[in-house]
């Protein structure tokens, strides 16, 4: 009996000693690095806002899962019929206790339309929005191919209409939202402090306190992750990601998203451009410039952007014999030195690989690193020979990306009038099957003219404390995170 009692007392003592640890873990503050300094807390009016803060304070109709697929958020379901999409709302409540209604969604949409800079976030995909009843809202799409679900996950935060005062100082407080956290304030270091919404409609968050701290450099972020002063480094570079593999307690994420890197070729000679297209070894680029992460492009644009067009047009990438055949047909001046303009270290590294490949077929190049503003001006003017560019976001599809060939909407590339007209025409075709066929023809011609040379799907990176659960890999590509879904491991 004494032995049993001693064992029970020992268990009680262990639990007593352990209890403060569990309490400390439950009360632990989650610290997240911001992407942008928060100087504004109203998502309906233009200002500097951070996605981590916005998604903590406000809900969106849709969300992303780990792989970037769209899943229900404030909306529990939806169905598309032609250019109409009907959303059915969950039973959700704002932080003041009022029910979230379809009219609040319409109000949020219409308020954004009144902002001269933010309105394009809506007009790119939607022509209108109306409430059918308190739980049902219908959007009229601007076109039937737009990625409306992604726009809704990223850009339409739902704000309560009742009590909304447009004259409020949004630099010091947000409007009323329905998110998992409540705004507590911002200190002089620009750290935003949030506390859990105890009445959150989708369940009270496990982590009760969140701090979103100002941006820091990668080296400082990695040290802070390892010392426990930071839990999420929202976006890091390739070198920092590689370093996470050697760090205890830190998890690095590499995510192939909606962006691919390619080469703009402004040389007005199609055989020259075809030679360049086939001279570049994409596998070498991935191995050297991405440390084996990422993948050589199989399509004109990133796999996630290509969607149903992925694999519709097959093309030959690296083929040295074909490159030599094309350069032999070219009338371009091979005695001159062509410039590859870059603006950062990563594109400069890729340029070195391309420079070596082009030298094999007799094209001499010089790498010129410009300040980003100068580089951009030269790019938009076509005042360069080559440049390496990363293109694509989760909110665009192939029809949208083809606009790079339209000088009125994209870049002054040396392409035919026929291609420009096809690019302009394809998105206007209402019938889905007819538009698909026309887009495929447009891609085929774009590949032939080779003014855009797809290189590799470009991964993006972030890192977090390994004890953190509920993270999503897609954060690396979108900077969207859901702190309300996170918890610390016991």
For each feature predicted by the language model, list its residue ranges.
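Ligand-site clamp/hinge motif
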Residues: 198-242, 364
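A structural "hinge/loop" feature
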Residues: 35-52, 74, 148-157, 264, ...
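Structural transition elements
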Residues: 8, 278, 295-329, 347-349
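N-terminal lobe/hinge region of extracytoplasmic solute-binding protein
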Residues: 33-80, 110, 176-177
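Detector for C-terminal structural segments
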Residues: 280-307, 346-355, 379-490
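Surface-exposed binding/hinge segments that line
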Residues: 79, 84, 121-163
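Alpha-helical secondary-structure segments
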Residues: 102-108, 134-138, 179-180, 207-209, ...
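Gly/Pro-rich hinge or "lid" segments in bacterial periplasmic/extracellular proteins
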Residues: 48, 65-69, 153-205, 209, ...
């Amino acid at each position: 009996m004494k032995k049993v009692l001693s064992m029970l007392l020992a268990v009680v003592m262990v639990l007593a000693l352990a209890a403060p640890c569990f309490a400390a873990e439950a009360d632990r503050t989650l610290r997240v690095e911001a992407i942008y300094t928060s100087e504004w807390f109203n998502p309906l009016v233009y200002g500097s806002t951070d996605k981590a803060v916005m998604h903590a304070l406000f809900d969106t109709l849709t969300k992303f899962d780990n792989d970037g697929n769209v899943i229900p958020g404030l909306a529990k379901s939806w169905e598309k019929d032609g250019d109409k999409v009907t959303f059915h709302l969950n039973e959700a409540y704002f932080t003041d206790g009022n029910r979230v209604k379809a009219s609040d969604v319409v109000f949020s949409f219409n308020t954004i339309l009144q902002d001269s800079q933010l309105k394009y976030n809506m007009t790119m995909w939607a022509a209108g929005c109306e409430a059918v009843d308190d739980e049902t809202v219908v959007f009229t799409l601007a076109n039937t191919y737009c990625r409306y679900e992604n726009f809704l996950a990223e850009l339409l935060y739902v704000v309560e209409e009742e009590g909304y005062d447009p004259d409020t100082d949004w630099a010091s407080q947000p409007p009323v939202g329905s998110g998992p956290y409540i705004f507590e304030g911002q200190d002089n270091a620009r750290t935003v402090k949030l506390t859990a919404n105890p009445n959150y409609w989708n369940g009270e968050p496990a982590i009760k306190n969140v701090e979103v701290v100002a941006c820091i450099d990668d080296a400082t972020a990695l040290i802070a992750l390892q010392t426990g002063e930071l839990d999420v480094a929202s976006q890091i570079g390739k070198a920092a990601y590689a370093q996470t593999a050697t760090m205890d307690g830190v998890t690095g994420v590499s995510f192939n998203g909606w962006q691919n890197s390619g080469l703009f070729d402004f040389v007005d000679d199609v055989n020259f451009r075809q030679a360049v297209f086939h001279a570049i070894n994409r596998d070498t680029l991935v191995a050297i410039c991405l440390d084996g992460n990422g993948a050589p492009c199989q399509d004109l644009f990133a796999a996630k952007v290509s969607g149903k067009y992925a694999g519709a047009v097959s093309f030959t990438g690296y083929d040295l014999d074909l490159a030599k055949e094309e350069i032999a047909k070219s009338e371009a001046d091979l005695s001159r030195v062509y410039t590859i303009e870059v603006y950062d270290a990563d594109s400069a590294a890729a340029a070195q690989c391309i420079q070596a490949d082009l030298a094999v077929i007799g094209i001499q190049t010089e790498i010129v690193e410009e300040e980003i503003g100068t580089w951009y001006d030269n790019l938009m003017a076509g005042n360069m020979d080559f440049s390496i560019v990363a293109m694509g976001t989760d909110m665009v599809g192939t029809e949208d990306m083809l606009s790079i060939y339209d000088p009125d909407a994209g870049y002054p590339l040396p392409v035919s009038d026929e291609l420009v007209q096809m690019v302009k025409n394809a998105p206007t075709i209402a019938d889905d099957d007819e538009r698909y066929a026309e887009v495929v023809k447009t891609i085929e011609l774009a590949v032939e003219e080779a003014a855009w040379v797809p290189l590799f799907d470009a991964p993006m990176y972030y890192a977090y404390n390994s004890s953190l659960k509920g993270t999503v890999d897609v954060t690396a590509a979108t900077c969207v995170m859901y702190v309300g879904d996170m918890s610390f491991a016991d």
